[in-house]
A protein has these predicted regions:
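Short, conserved charged micro-motifs
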Residues: 77, 197-202, 250-257, 344-351, ...
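Intrinsic-disorder-associated, low-complexity terminal segments enriched in Asp/Asn/His/Tyr and depleted
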Residues: 296-298, 307, 314, 328
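Glycine-biased, low-complexity coil/linker segments
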Residues: 303-305, 321-325
Length: 440
């Protein structure tokens, strides 16, 4: 299909483009940089609305912990601006486009529309929790704003949150206001070796229930740990369980000491190696995310911590790879993201392994399972989910994503509600039609 691209340079031009599409009955594929084009179902549209021309930071009030930018602003620009003030996006968005140093990669609009969050979600919340305000154009051709530009403002509070994770099916976003937070001064990661999945998830639960403010809790089975670019993890010779602590330097040191004794940890990674291994977890590098790039320099000894000054944070390598793309290659396994009650994670994986050969690792204390699986696995994977769990097909060829429920199938009442919401914003179905569910 030949696609005609419309590239507005102002919000008014974006509104005009949507109004034209509405009057002509032409569906639009909403794009920024295109880094998340492989997420969700392929959009069947003859026209693309490229919002990358709406770029630039509108306002950055670091003292108020608020940043407003146009939707097409590259995340690399935002990352660098925040870093200059010692701030960041606390929900730790994954870099899915191969930019290992990008806070989510791509553009701000794509980041919020996809709603993805990284390991720190367990303590800092999701992308939705950090979205304060939006401006955009609905499928009715109406330009509107929702939310506010201060952290305590609750006017229109639900509208911005509705857009986070909507994958451009409700509104073509033109401007977004997000909450930013101080980046942690220091970070350290406790390592525990040789635990099976169930024991590891139980230990992570203990760590998260402790008073020590754990900000990352992941488990890497032996095959995954061996492929880490951090020598202290790859050299463990088996499974590795990770517990991260962040904050002011003295506080981190004190909490690590207490946690190490309580959990009987085998080793501690210093700041440099902690940043490296959590990038790997965040970006699912072992499953075709950003290439790990080999053992990390200055690894700590396996029996203890390392020199926290051995590697300055700005000298960390930025691993570069193909991201979560490459899904159209026939030899690429399908990538799934399973959200489950943490205690149910290992049993869910065990049930799936009765019929499928899969590879996994756990994040969010066991509540997030990253899984590489062979083709035609959807029925087995979703059949093993416990009540309340859901599975998203993150990477697969276009033809598979067009024929498979990429997101967890919704029960009848929830699907009816989703249709009413879609009809309220986009009654003619011109914005990213079918991106999340067929016919929606």
């Amino acid at each position: 299909m030949t696609i005609t691209t419309l590239k507005p340079e102002t919000a008014a031009q974006a509104a005009d483009a949507v109004r034209w599409a509405l009057s002509a009955g032409e569906p639009l594929e909403i794009l920024g940089s295109g880094s998340r084009r492989g997420l969700g179902r392929p959009v069947q549209a003859g026209h693309a609305l490229d919002l990358s021309g709406l770029s630039g930071v509108v306002a950055y009030e670091s003292e108020e912990l608020v940043l407003t930018a146009l939707a097409g602003t590259p995340m690399a620009t935002i990352r660098d601006m925040l870093a200059d003030r010692g701030q960041h996006l606390a929900f730790e968005p994954p870099a899915i486009d191969g930019d290992g140093c990008g806070e989510g990669g791509g553009t701000l609009g794509g980041l919020i529309a996809s709603g993805l969050a990284g390991p720190r979600r367990i303590s800092a919340g999701s992308a939705r929790d950090h979205t304060l305000g939006i401006a955009g154009v609905s499928g009715r051709g109406e330009a509107y704003k929702g939310g506010g530009k201060v952290v305590k403002n609750v006017t229109g509070y639900d509208m911005p949150k509705l857009m986070a994770g909507s994958f451009g099916t409700l509104t073509a976003l033109t401007e977004i206001t997000v909450k930013v937070l101080p980046a942690p001064e220091d970070t350290a990661t406790l390592l525990l070796f040789g635990l099976d999945d169930a024991a590891a998830v139980g230990l992570l639960d203990r760590a998260l229930r402790s008073p020590y403010e754990v900000s990352g809790a992941a488990h890497l089975p032996a095959g995954i740990a061996a492929r880490s670019g951090v020598a202290g993890v790859a050299g463990a010779g088996g499974a590795v369980t990770l517990v991260r602590v962040e904050g002011f330097g003295p506080s981190v040191a004190a909490r690590v000491a207490m946690l190490r004794e309580e959990l009987r940890a085998d080793a501690v990674l210093d700041r440099g190696c902690s940043l490296a291994v959590w990038r790997e977890v965040r970006d699912a590098v072992w499953f075709g995310g950003v290439a790990a790039g080999g053992p990390h320099p200055n690894p700590p000894p396996l029996g203890g911590g390392g020199d926290s000054a051995a590697l300055a944070p700005d000298s960390l390598p930025c691993p570069v790879g193909e991201g979560w793309g490459g899904g159209n290659r026939s030899d690429t396994p399908h990538l799934w993201k399973l959200s489950v009650p943490p205690s149910a994670g290992p049993a869910t994986v065990a049930a799936i392994r009765r019929t499928l050969d899969v590879e996994v690792f756990y994040d969010w204390g066991g509540g997030l399972v990253w899984m590489e699986a062979p083709p035609e696995s959807a029925t087995a994977i979703r059949g093993a989910l416990s009540a309340g769990g859901h599975a998203m097909l993150v990477r697969a060829p276009d033809a598979v994503r067009a024929a498979t429920e990429v997101f967890q199938p919704l029960p009848g009442p929830l699907m009816a509600l989703s249709r009413r919401v879609k009809d309220g914003f986009d009654p003619k179905g011109i914005l990213n039609p079918g991106r999340m569910y067929a016919g929606l």
